[in-house]
């Protein structure tokens, strides 16, 4: 018997005559090609009965069998069967729609807290609703859309309404036959499933089979909600799967669906919050975005008037206009909480409106008001005990990453059925099918934070519940974003005024324990020996502002001497300025400012809220406040900052002396401005380069026009300029600009110059060589890698090396010098007047032919200590010549780089001899070389030799066999002075060249 998935098809096939069935089978040989599917062998088709043919089709063409048979019915002139099949399909689709309508009407009524008429809700989300229709109605191809916004802005409510409207026949009717709605966080305890099982769990009886439903993926929409609270990592994976029937780990199924590996023809509508956007968005293909903007001031008033009767609503709306709570009420969930809180207050016949500057104060008012309405006359001790059970449930769920609770979870945490009924009435909890959830995930975070204020030493320890230091570590050092809201409440509840709100219902709650735990954690984090570093400082600053406790804020920020901040919005700039202006200990600040912060593009009128307009208006003030601390810093790193002209002018003003801040008060020693899109007209240089302690200036990746370069050079020539390290890599500096720079450095204090990754060409180097020949030039290091140089540049450098007495490091890496160019350099190095100590020549297209000259230099030059020849084709012959030179008693070389060079393991004997005879060699880089085991044995014998003085060997141990890795580990154990490292010089070379990566918070 064909499985239930093919029962409907079998009934239709049985209506075919034998002749029609034979013709049907013959046509089936060709039909798969129309659907771009692999054909079934004719032998299998020919020998099939009607029953076995259905099984065959469902096995080979899951999800396509129904459509294929509809087409074949028409071809055998049985249009009646095709019509009958389509009617069956429509009937079952209608059943599903009716079932979903009933389900989501219940959810909308019982679980969705709009508390206003539907017509009023549609007016509030009119823009987003139109966007949803346009996105899906205008496209016939699969679409992925995101509903984005901050927590509590109504994303889930919007999606529930969309689902209800589709099921009611008023939305996307011509686009989708099936719409499935899943809250993905409810899968947190499901380790394995198939997409077919997930879909089946939502289907009523007598629905189409999953095979039939998925036969036309273009008519299917998946609405996925709750990614902020999903515990699974959905990062890009190589083991994705296209089989929707196969049971797989939950994260593989979800990731395969999101990345369109599984059911690529379906459409997706996803709810993504601030936590999930950076984790999920990059997995999606060309997503369209619908942004929930929150309530405008007008919408808040409209909501209040809809929530209450007209007269009371007007009174509430008028009061809100002058209430600090208004900016919080732009969040729809908080607006609902505010109105609910007032309703309870009015029911108790209490006068006045509560005020709240922070989320913690807001939620505390809501929670206390709910308790007063139910337990007004209960002793505070009883209320505290009741509250503690709810808080324990919340915090246990947070640590387990659990947001959907069963009856056992409630019972284990001391919540009885009668307690549950009270929490449901208070709207702290709500039902979720047969399970229970908090009324909003943010409410769970609030009660979880409250747990730490109710906790006592005598309490029984629950192993799964972490300590405050563990919680803070997850938030600020390990980047676990699901804890951020809890952290905001934890800091907010520290406030004495917020604690006072709790006292009437719950007695005296002392926040000092939590405060001390927080301070202790950051004290440890700020110590150098701590393995963890602060990663989310902007979140910390937001939490500190929510505490509203000046002394506490100062105590925390003064524990941190170095901070990295990613400023992505005006609000982040605001909290950063608030926190850092209170620091007296900060020495190093690494700052990244995104383009949107200083953008002059405003939102459309319908998106404007009082909050958003205020933020834009105050951005300049926040920036000025932050700039005010720069004079006290020792290191300022402006990495990939996107400024407008006004912001640059404010930066310039902050670095200028005033009557209250004289020039001598500025402590800045190091300034980096890498990858800045706009450096202004260059007038900033005059201000910066007069700072009395500024010794280091790095502009890597920041384009400098000719005019800006000239202003930089003018500032360098000023006698007040004390810059010693000037790093101008990747600044678009031409040969002509290089000439101007060279002239400005003749009488300057600059000792280290990096011009890497600029098209200087030979003409530019000629100008630099003229500078080097001037007796007034004090330059000691010159970095010229990737500067489009040829052997001709080496002719100019030959003369400069002979006349300059200060230059000790010359980097010519990754230039087309060839053997001819290096031979010219060797002639200079053989001269006793040449004082160069380090020569970097990696990737210069060298062969073994230049190694004879280099070897001669190693023998006769007593000054050269470092020679880097990596990534050159010097072959075995070249390595042997170098090893002979190293073995010479006159050789003084200390560091030799042969990483990525072309040579074989046969050279290991020569290297071993050099290691045991050269008394000065302490660093040998063979990184990226995978020597065979026999060669490695020879090398390791030399490393264990008592005459070997090597301290660093560059090798990637992980690239070798287990046997070879064990050999290298044994060498390190026996020789305590030796370190075998991968990328041994990477950081040092990067620092010397001044190169930076494009912004990353971990850079």
Swiss-Prot record:
One of its GO terms (molecular function) is ATP binding. It is found in: Cytoplasm; Inflammasome. Keywords: ATP-binding, Cytoplasm, Immunity, Inflammasome, Inflammatory response, Innate immunity, Leucine-rich repeat, Nucleotide-binding, Repeat. One of its GO terms (cellular component) is canonical inflammasome complex. Disruption phenotype: No visible phenotype. Mutant mice exhibit normal gut homeostasis and microbiota composition. Following rotavirus infection, mutant animals have higher viral loads in the small intestine, increased fecal shedding of viral antigens, and more frequent incidences of diarrhea compared to wild-type littermates. Mice with a conditional knockout in ileum intestinal epithelial cells are also more susceptible to rotavirus infection compared to control animals. ATP binds at residues 149-156. InterPro entries: DAPIN (IPR004020), DEATH-like_dom_sf (IPR011029), LRR_dom_sf (IPR032675), NACHT_NTPase (IPR007111), NLRP_HD2 (IPR041267), NLRP_innate_immun_reg (IPR050637), NOD1/2_WH (IPR041075), P-loop_NTPase (IPR027417). Its main location: cytoplasm. Residues 143-465 form the NACHT domain. LRR repeats lie at residues 749-770, 778-799, 806-826, 835-856, 863-883, 892-913, 920-940. Residues 1-91 form the Pyrin domain. Sensor component of NLRP9 inflammasomes. Inflammasomes are supramolecular complexes that assemble in the cytosol in response to pathogens, such as rotavirus, but not encephalomyocarditis virus (EMCV), and play critical roles in innate immunity and inflammation. The core of NLRP9 inflammasomes consists of a signal sensor component (NLRP9), an adapter (ASC/PYCARD), which recruits an effector pro-inflammatory caspase (CASP1). Within the complex, NLRP9 and PYCARD interact via their respective DAPIN/pyrin domains. As the sensor component of the NLRP9 inflammasome, plays a crucial role in innate immunity and inflammation. In response to pathogens, including rotavirus, initiates the formation of the inflammasome polymeric complex, made of NLRP9, PYCARD and CASP1. Recruitment of proCASP1 to the inflammasome promotes its activation and CASP1-catalyzed IL1B and IL18 maturation and release in the extracellular milieu. The active cytokines stimulate inflammatory responses. Inflammasomes can also induce pyroptosis, an inflammatory form of programmed cell death. This is NACHT, LRR and PYD domains-containing protein 9B. It comes from Mus musculus (Mouse). The lineage of its organism: Eukaryota, Metazoa, Chordata, Craniata, Vertebrata.
């Amino acid at each position: 018997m064909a499985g239930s998935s093919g029962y409907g098809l079998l009934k239709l096939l049985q209506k075919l005559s034998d002749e029609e069935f034979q013709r049907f089978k013959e046509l089936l040989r060709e039909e798969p090609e129309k659907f771009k599917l692999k054909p079934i062998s004719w032998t299998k088709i020919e020998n099939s009965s009607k029953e076995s043919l259905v099984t065959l089709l469902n096995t080979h063409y899951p999800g396509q069998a129904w459509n294929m048979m509809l087409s074949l019915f028409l071809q055998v002139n049985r249009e009646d069967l095709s019509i009958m099949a389509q009617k069956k399909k429509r009937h079952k689709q209608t059943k599903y729609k009716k079932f979903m309508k009933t389900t989501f009407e219940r959810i909308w009524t019982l679980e969705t807290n709009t508390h206003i008429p539907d017509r009023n809700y549609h007016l509030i989300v009119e823009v987003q609703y139109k966007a949803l229709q346009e996105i899906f109605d205008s496209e016939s191809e699969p679409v992925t859309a995101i509903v984005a916004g901050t927590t509590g802005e109504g994303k889930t409510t919007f999606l529930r309404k969309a689902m209800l409207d589709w099921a009611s026949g008023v939305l996307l009717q011509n686009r989708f036959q099936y719409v499935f709605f899943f809250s993905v966080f409810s899968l947190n305890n499901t380790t394995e499933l198939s997409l077919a099982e997930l879909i089946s769990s939502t289907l009523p009886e007598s629905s189409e089979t999953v095979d039939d439903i998925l036969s036309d993926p273009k008519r299917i929409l998946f609405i996925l909600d709750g990614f902020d609270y999903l515990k699974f990592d959905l990062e890009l994976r190589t083991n994705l799967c296209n089989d929707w029937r196969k049971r797989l780990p939950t994260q593989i199924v979800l990731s395969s669906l999101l990345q369109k590996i599984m059911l690529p023809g379906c459409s997706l509508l996803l709810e993504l919050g601030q936590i999930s956007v950076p984790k999920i968005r990059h997995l999606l293909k060309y997503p369209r975005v619908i942004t929930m903007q929150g309530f405008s001031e007008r919408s808040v008033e409209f909501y209040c008037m809809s929530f209450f009767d007209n007269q009371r609503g007007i009174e509430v709306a008028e009061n809100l206009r002058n209430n600090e709570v208004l900016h919080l009420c732009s969040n729809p969930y908080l607006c609902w909480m505010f109105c609910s809180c007032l309703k309870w207050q009015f029911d108790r016949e209490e006068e006045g409106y509560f005020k709240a500057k922070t989320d913690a104060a807001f939620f505390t008012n809501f929670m206390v008001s709910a308790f007063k309405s139910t337990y007004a006359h209960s002793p505070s001790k009883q209320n505290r005990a009741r509250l503690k059970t709810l808080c324990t449930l919340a915090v246990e769920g947070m640590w387990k990453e659990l947001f959907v609770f069963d009856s056992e979870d409630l019972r284990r945490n001391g919540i009885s059925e009668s307690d549950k009924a009270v929490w449901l009435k208070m709207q702290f909890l709500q039902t979720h099918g047969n399970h229970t959830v908090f009324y909003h995930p943010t409410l769970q975070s609030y009660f979880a934070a409250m747990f730490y204020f109710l906790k006592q030493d005598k309490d029984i320890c629950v192993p799964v519940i972490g300590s405050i230091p563990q919680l803070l570590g997850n938030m600020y050092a390990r980047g676990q974003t699901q804890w951020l809201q809890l952290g905001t409440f934890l800091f907010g509840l520290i406030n004495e005024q917020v604690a006072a709100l709790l006292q009437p219902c719950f007695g005296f709650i002392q926040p000092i324990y939590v405060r001390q735990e927080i301070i202790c954690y950051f004290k440890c984090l700020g110590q150098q020996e701590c393995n963890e570093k602060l990663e989310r400082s902007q979140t910390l600053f937001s939490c500190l502002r929510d505490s509203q406790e000046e002394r506490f804020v100062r105590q925390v920020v003064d524990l941190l001497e170095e901070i990295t901040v990613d400023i992505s919005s005006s609000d982040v700039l605001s909290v950063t300025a608030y926190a850092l202006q209170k620091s007296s200990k900060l020495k190093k600040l690494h700052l990244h400012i995104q383009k949107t912060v200083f953008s002059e593009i405003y939102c459309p009128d319908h998106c404007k809220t009082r909050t958003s307009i205020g933020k834009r208006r105050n951005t300049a003030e926040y920036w000025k406040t932050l700039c005010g601390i720069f004079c006290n810093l020792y290191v300022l790193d402006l990495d990939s900052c996107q400024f407008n002209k006004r912001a640059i002018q404010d930066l310039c003003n902050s670095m200028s002396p005033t009557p209250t801040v004289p020039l001598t008060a500025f402590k800045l020693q190091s300034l980096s401005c890498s990858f800045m899109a706009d450096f202004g007209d260059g007038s900033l240089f005059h201000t910066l380069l007069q700072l009395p302690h500024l010794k280091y200036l790095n502009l890597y990746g920041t384009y400098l026009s000719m005019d800006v370069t000239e202003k930089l050079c003018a500032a360098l020539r000023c006698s007040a300029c004390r810059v010693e390290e000037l790093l101008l890599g990747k600044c678009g500096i031409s040969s002509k600009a290089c000439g101007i720079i060279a002239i400005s450095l003749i009488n300057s204090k600059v000792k280290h110059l990096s011009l890497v990754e600029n098209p200087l060409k030979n003409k530019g180097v000629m100008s630099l060589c003229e500078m080097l020949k001037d007796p007034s030039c004090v330059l000691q290091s010159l970095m010229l890698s990737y500067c489009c140089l040829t052997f001709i540049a080496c002719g100019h450098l030959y003369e400069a090396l002979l006349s300059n007495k200060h230059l000790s490091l010359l980097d010519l890496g990754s230039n087309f010098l060839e053997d001819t160019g290096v031979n010219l350099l060797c002639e200079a190095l053989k001269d006793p007047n040449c004082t160069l100590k380090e020569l970097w020549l990696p990737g210069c297209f060298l062969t073994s032919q230049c190694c004879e000259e280099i070897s001669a230099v190693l023998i006769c030059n007593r000054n050269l200590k470092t020679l880097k020849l990596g990534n050159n084709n010097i072959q075995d012959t070249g390595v042997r010549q170098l090893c002979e030179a190293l073995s010479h008693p006159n050789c003084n070389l200390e560091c030799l780089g042969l990483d990525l060079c072309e040579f074989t393991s046969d050279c290991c004997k020569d290297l071993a001899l050099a290691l045991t005879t050269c008394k000065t060699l302490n660093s040998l880089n063979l990184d990226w070389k995978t020597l065979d085991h026999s060669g490695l044995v020879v090398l390791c014998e030399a490393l264990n030799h008592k005459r070997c003085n090597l301290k660093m060997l560059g090798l990637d141990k992980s690239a070798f066999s287990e046997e070879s890795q064990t050999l290298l580990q044994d060498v390190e154990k026996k020789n305590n002075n030796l370190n075998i490292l991968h990328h041994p010089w990477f950081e040092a070379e990067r620092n010397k060249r001044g190169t930076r990566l494009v912004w990353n918070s971990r850079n």
